[in-house]
Amino acid sequence: MIVDYHMHLRDSKEELALETLTVDPFVEAAHAAGVDEIGFTEHGYYFKHLAPLWSVPYMTERCVYDIEPYVEAVVAARGRGLPVKLGLEVDYVPDREEETRELLAPYPWDYLLGSVHFIGELSVDGEEFLLADAVGVEEAWRLYFETLAAAARSGLFDSLSHPDLVKIFGLRVASFDYGPVVNAIADAGVAVEVSTAGLSKPVRELYPHPEFLAVCRARDVPVTLASDAHSPDVVGRDFDQALELLRAAGYETVTVFDQRRRRQEPLG
């Protein structure tokens, strides 16, 4: 089975498309790409419902959409028998775990993606307010993976998206011990996604790095597949490379989510 469990109805330069019909082009693109099931995971920080989690103006200013039409659009598509799952990409905000849990509780998620795009007021993947510029590359890596481990331990998330996002601009440390963060992920029973999105970023490689994935495999961390598509033409892009990476690491199954329960299906 092939899944693509990370995509957005909102193009980065367009308004959030909320009509149910906007789901269909993604489904059609998935079928053409040989993807069996897709999951929509809009950014939580676009929704007014999650605005209370943020304190910095450049984040609260993003929270302009109602969450209900998004949920209803995906649920309606699922009700029509389309192979879609309802997810949300949620930024982990330290010390706001219970509030996050309460804000997300009313909705029928199939799974929740945990992301770390921000450390305090600094950005992991945005050139403005870039974490690595402010604290240096080694400290940025340390802070990022400490926060990712905390996200795993929070119990909020079913899977972690682009798990080594801190490398996005190709800024690296000479060596890094992935053991502690992977141990936190494994102990929490959280999956990680293998994402092809990094191939179109300055780093020009998959998320996560093969060394990271090898440690995940050694700890039996389950995996999903992801394109991080913001438009239908990106669904399933470069999945041949993702599958090659997974098989090289020894993975034979992929994680499928339904109502926040998971099961393993043969990969491919």
Predicted regions and their residues:
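Divalent metal-binding pocket/active-site signature
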Residues: 20, 45, 107-185, 190-206
